[in-house]
Structures are given as C-alpha cells and as structure tokens.
C-alpha cells in the first residue's frame, strides 16, 4: 500500500476508507466509504448517470457471473441511496442503517482485496486510463478484466 502514488483515485479512496474506519458515528462513516468507492469507480470527466455508472462498474469489478453482477448492482444501488439520504440530510438515526453499513463495509473489503490480489489492478486504477479501462470492462460484459496497457 505504501507504493501507491499520490494524486489518483486509489490514493483518494484509501484516505477516505481510513477516515471511515477511524470514525464511529454511522452518519459520518458511511459517506466516507462511498466517497472512497466513488474515487475508484466514477468518471473524472462524465458527470451524468453517476449512480448507474458507479453501480455498474462496481458490480462488474466484483462479480463472477451475471446473476451475482445483477445482485451486486441492486445492492450497490440501495446502499448508494442510503448514502444520498445521509448527504442530503434526509437520514434518520436508527437501526435501518445496519444492513446497508454491513453491505458497504463488505463491499469495501472485497474491492480492496481485489485491487491487491488481482495482477495489474493497482496499475490500472492509478493510471490516467482508468476510466477507459472500466468502460471497456463494462462494455465487454465479461467477468474478467479486459487487457490493460499502461
């Protein structure tokens, strides 16, 4: 992790994840986890359909088949909706945060594990070509990453 260069989505994500992990209150932790996921999976230049793009990219990154991809997309959409409620002041404290928090924490753990374990993933995600790489992955509808040329 010390080898991750600064000034890219991976660095921003790691900082957000660290801030989330060292926070206690759910309404502060939860958006930080999603800030990190947004740093990894949203576009730096395309500001339209952010939720759809985030959920699609995230679900293809994590899935190994079509059913899992759809399930992960749906779960990410629900969790991102919770993030939006918190950010926009519509969230009410209570136990309904427990499941989205558990799902989000599991997603973050799995994303970080895949970034570290899959050969070339850190390189692809710190690259200025990350957006093209993720678009190619989603367009391929494959459950393995496309070739990446730095």
Where are these regions (language model features)?
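Amphipathic, oligomerization/interface secondary-structure segments
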Residues: 1-150
